[in-house]
Amino acid sequence: MSKSALDPVEFLKGALEIPSPSGKERAVAEYLAEGMQKLGLKGFVDEADNARGQVGEGPVQVVLLGHIDTVPGQIPVRLEGGRLFGRGAVDAKGPFVAMIFAAAGLSEEARRRLTVHLVGATEEEAPSSKGARFVAPRLKPHYAVIGEPSGWEGITLGYKGRLLVKARREKDHFHSAHHEPNAAEELISYFVAIKAWAEAMNVGQRPFDQVQYTLRDFRVHPAELRQVAEMFFDLRLPPRLPPEEAIRHLTAYAPPTIELEFFGREVPYQGPKDTPLTRAFRQAIRKAGGRPVFKLKTGTSDMNVLAPHWPVPMVAYGPGDSTLDHTPYEHVEVAEFLKGIEVLRGALEALAQTHAGEKEG
């Protein structure tokens, strides 16, 4: 099939029509890999069920990594009023498909200077981040772009870190008339103390530099002889508070009778504003008629997973409005999606020009 036979909007629509909740991405990975082959790229599915692609034979290694899993909850896929609706339209099949078409449209000159590796990663929406962790030791990029919705004029420099916490209190049962806090009350007191600590940390700080806390679950288990209470909460961490430092604070505030368990540790990341990669994106956005805007996100992404492994210029970029992530009306504007392809391709071309004096492969 010729390259022109694949329309980017129709191809994205096809990807949205294949459900791919975390852990069940194989079908959409095969669809995407086949599409990459039709576009003239090397396309395959790896052992982690990532959709993989490669183009170019240059010395400069560039990774374009987006995720192809979604949160649960299907949305009827439809093209309506210049908008493409579907689960993953912005988070994040849309950004990854934009990466595919940008790479497929590279000039021969850029292909001689760059080798572009495409990764449609699995299980980003799960604590495992399976796909990103699989490629982390296997690829050695000079530059990395994470496919997440930033808006076509936006360049995301960083994401907050995360820590998931489970707290448990078990104690002997006693009569409610007894003047002693029960297991549930002890956990509530602990969470109130953590809230006070976080609020003290947040004084005078912008949102990206604040500690955010969310109580996710609270349960009291009925028992005749023992009281058992459990709660689950998460913290969103600024760059000044890595997970291990947060754990020290959380442990210090906990009475010895409360059991704590920590998991889902994601290191916060914030990259510099001025690198060859950010300059390439700024140039491409302006060339497409836009005004570049740097962004910092309070959520997490595969950038948090990969930054410790790849100490190279890294940004997140992708068409779409991130406020639509996980919502029942998730959609991407078709014009925005096409602009995203144009900007990604332009950024890669600009990056190739940056390395014009280097020996080609």
From Swiss-Prot:
GO terms for biological process: lysine biosynthetic process via aminoadipic acid. The active site is at D69, E124 (proton acceptor). One of its GO terms (cellular component) is cytoplasm. Zn(2+) 2 binds at D91, E125, H326. Binds 2 Zn(2+) or Co(2+) ions per subunit. Its cofactor is Zn(2+); Co(2+). It holds the Pfam family Peptidase_M20. Its main location: cytoplasm. NCBIfam families: dapE-lys-deAc (TIGR01902), PRK04443.1 (NF003367). Catalyzes the release of L-lysine from [LysW]-gamma-L-lysine. This is [LysW]-lysine hydrolase. It comes from Thermus thermophilus (strain ATCC 27634 / DSM 579 / HB8).
